[in-house]
C-alpha cells in the first residue's frame, strides 16, 4: 500500500472514530432533553416475548405521567392491567380475579424502566457502553438503533436496544434477558403532554378479588 495513502487512511479513521462517539452522545442528549421536558405520554404498544422456543404477542395502550406513574392496559389476546402510582404497583388479571401488589422499589419487572422515561433521564448513565447497533437494522431506515448494558437491571437483562426516530422519540425497546429470552416493546401513536388525572394511575379491586402481596407475575 502507498505510504502516503496509508497515512491519509489512518488520519481519516482517527477522525471518524471520535466523531461517531460524539454523534451517539449528541443523540443521547437530544433524547434526554426530549423526555425530560415532557409531563405525560400516551402510546399504543405491542409486547413481543421470545423464549424457550415460544413467542407471545400482546398489545394495548400505555400512559406515563410524572413522577413515575404508568398504566398498561392489555387488550389482546386477553385483558390485564398493570398500574403504578409512583409508589405502589398493581397487576390485575380479570379472568383469574386476582390482584398482585408490590412497591415500585421492590419491583422486579421488565416494564419498570419505562416509568423513568419521565424522570430525569440520562441515557449515558443508565446504559453503560452506549453505542450504535451496526449488525442489525432498525424497523424504519430513517431511525437509529442504540444498545447498552442497563445499570438498573443487573441480573435481569444483558442488553437494552433503543430505536430512536429523527424527532428523538423512542419507538422500540428490546431487552435481551439474562436467561436468553428477549422482550420487545413497540410503540406507535405517541401523544405527549396530555392532561391525565392521577385517578388513572390508581386501582381499587372489584369485590371478591383475591389480593396477593409480593412480586408480580408476567
Protein language model regions, located:
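A generic structural motif
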Residues: 46-50, 73-75, 92-94, 149-151, ...
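Gly/Pro-enriched, hydrophobic low-complexity segments
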Residues: 125-208, 212-215
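Flexible, surface-exposed loop/linker segments and immediately adjacent secondary-structure boundaries
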Residues: 97-142
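Sec-dependent signal peptide recognition
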Residues: 4-12
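An acidic-aromatic
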Residues: 61-113, 183-184
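Extracytoplasmic
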Residues: 38-40, 57-59, 65-67, 77, ...
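N-terminal leader/targeting segments and the immediate start of mature chains
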Residues: 17-56, 69, 205-218
Amino acid at each position: 500500500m502507498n505510504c502516503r495513502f496509508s497515512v491519509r487512511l489512518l488520519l481519516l479513521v482517527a477522525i471518524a472514530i471520535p466523531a461517531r462517539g460524539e454523534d451517539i452522545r449528541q443523540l443521547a442528549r437530544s433524547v434526554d432533553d426530549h423526555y425530560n421536558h415532557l409531563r405525560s405520554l400516551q402510546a399504543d404498544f405491542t409486547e413481543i416475548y421470545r423464549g424457550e422456543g415460544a413467542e407471545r404477542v400482546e398489545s394495548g395502550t400505555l400512559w406515563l405521567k410524572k413522577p413515575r406513574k404508568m398504566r398498561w392496559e392489555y387488550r389482546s389476546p386477553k385483558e390485564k392491567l398493570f398500574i403504578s402510582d409512583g409508589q405502589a404497583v398493581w397487576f390485575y388479571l380479570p379472568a383469574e380475579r386476582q390482584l398482585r401488589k408490590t412497591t415500585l422499589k421492590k419491583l422486579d419487572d421488565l416494564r419498570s424502566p419505562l416509568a423513568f422515561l419521565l424522570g430525569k433521564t440520562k441515557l449515558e448513565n443508565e446504559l453503560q457502553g452506549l453505542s450504535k447497533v451496526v449488525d442489525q437494522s432498525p424497523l424504519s431506515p430513517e431511525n437509529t438503533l442504540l444498545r447498552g448494558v442497563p445499570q438498573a437491571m443487573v441480573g435481569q437483562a444483558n442488553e437494552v436496544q433503543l430505536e430512536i426516530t429523527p424527532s428523538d422519540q423512542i419507538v422500540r425497546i428490546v431487552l435481551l434477558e439474562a436467561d436468553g429470552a428477549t422482550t420487545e416493546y413497540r410503540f406507535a401513536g405517541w401523544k405527549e403532554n396530555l392532561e391525565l388525572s392521577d385517578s388513572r394511575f390508581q386501582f381499587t379491586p372489584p369485590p371478591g378479588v383475591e389480593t396477593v402481596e409480593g412480586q408480580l407475575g408476567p
